């Protein structure tokens, strides 16, 4: 990996170093959420890409890391729902950030699913200038005890539905798990930042309303 992360578990990552919260959406998308959960399908490292995509060396590396640790290469990491356009309010959130060439994906992590520690490789979203690539996560339901998100060695927790965060994807190892009995649902957007995107993400305490 080309990561510049320190990988020292005794150096505690400070607030804002590995991830940053940047605003909140307010609205009621509970009805859409029920349908999103129902429509989601489990994925592994190998099946998380689009259908027909060949397995790349990064996926082989992740599977090797899993099996070396005694886990199955077919570990269910999350459920996915790729049909964001089907849900009006959630899609409104996705379109709000004015990203270019971007992917929308809803993650529904159910009880017992674990996304093992890894570093993202998102260079393909803008090969000419990967520094313009951003991954934005919007939590779609409230945090429950037993739901884990870790960036570097700092926990991200106690979020409310609608909270937005970004992280230093080329460098920060991160992982998630759900040991609660409630599906953890988040909207993940990955693409090229525009000036509008930056303006939105720099408004840290901003509240956005979804009708």
Tell where the protein language model's regions lie, with residue ranges.
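Short beta-strand-to-loop capping motifs
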Residues: 23-27, 140, 189-191
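Short, flexible, solvent-exposed loop/turn segments with mixed acidic/basic and small polar residues
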Residues: 9-12, 125-127, 178
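A general secondary-structure signal for short beta-strands and their flanking turns/coil
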Residues: 18, 133, 182-184
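Non-heme Fe(II)/2-oxoglutarate
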Residues: 1-100, 105-106
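Catalytic core of Fe(II)/2-oxoglutarate
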Residues: 142-211
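Catalytic core of non-heme Fe(II) oxygenases with the double-stranded beta-helix
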Residues: 91-168
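Positively charged, low-complexity intrinsically disordered regions
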Residues: 49, 55, 104, 119, ...
């Amino acid at each position: 990996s080309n990561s510049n992360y320190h990988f020292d578990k005794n150096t505690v990552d400070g607030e804002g170093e590995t991830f940053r919260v940047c605003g909140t959406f307010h609205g009621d998308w509970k009805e859409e959420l029920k349908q999103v959960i129902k429509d989601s399908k489990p994925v592994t490292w190998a099946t998380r890409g689009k259908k027909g995509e060949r397995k790349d060396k990064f996926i082989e590396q992740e599977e090797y890391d899993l099996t070396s640790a005694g886990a199955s290469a077919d570990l269910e990491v999350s459920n996915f729902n790729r049909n964001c356009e089907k849900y009006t309010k959630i899609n409104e959130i996705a379109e709000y950030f004015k990203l270019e060439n971007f992917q929308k994906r809803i993650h529904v992590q159910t009880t017992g699913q674990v996304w093992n520690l890894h570093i993202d490789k998102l260079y393909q979203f803008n090969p000419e200038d990967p520094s313009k690539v951003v991954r934005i996560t919007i939590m779609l339901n409230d945090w429950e005890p037993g739901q884990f998100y870790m960036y570097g060695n700092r926990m991200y927790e106690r979020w409310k539905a609608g909270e937005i965060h970004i992280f230093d994807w080329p460098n920060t190892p991160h992982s998630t798990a759900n040991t609660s009995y409630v599906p953890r649902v988040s909207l993940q957007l990955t693409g090229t930042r525009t000036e509008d995107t930056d303006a939105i993400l720099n408004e840290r305490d901003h509240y956005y309303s979804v009708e």
